[in-house]
Amino acid sequence: MFTINAEVRKEQGKGASRRLRTANKFPAIIYGGSEAPIAIELDHDQVMNMQAKAEFYSEVLTLVVDGKEVKVKAQAVQRHAYKPKLTHIDFVRA
């Protein structure tokens, strides 16, 4: 089982996302279920190491968002065109 630490995003938009990526983080979102969507930010290196394993895409993951655990599955992963970097992930509540 994978456990990923996340923080709720305070800013949104292109400029805020670029600042996150410069700080070695990237934006993501959690949606689905009866709760409202949550915009989050993740540590790039931590997630990059986890997503190298095939189980990352098929198993239920645990996101710890500000101390609260959320069970999710990776829905869509966006990558940089030619660099080995993640730019965004969509998570669906499990």
From Swiss-Prot:
Disulfide bonds: none annotated. One of its GO terms (biological process) is translation. Keywords: Ribonucleoprotein, Ribosomal protein, RNA-binding, rRNA-binding. GO terms for molecular function: 5S rRNA binding; structural constituent of ribosome. The keyword rRNA processing does not apply. GO terms for cellular component: cytosolic large ribosomal subunit. PANTHER family: RIBOSOMAL PROTEIN L25/GLN-TRNA SYNTHETASE, ANTI-CODON-BINDING DOMAIN-CONTAINING PROTEIN (PTHR33284), RIBOSOMAL PROTEIN L25_GLN-TRNA SYNTHETASE, ANTI-CODON-BINDING DOMAIN-CONTAINING PROTEIN (PTHR33284:SF1). This is Large ribosomal subunit protein bL25. It comes from Salmonella gallinarum (strain 287/91 / NCTC 13346).
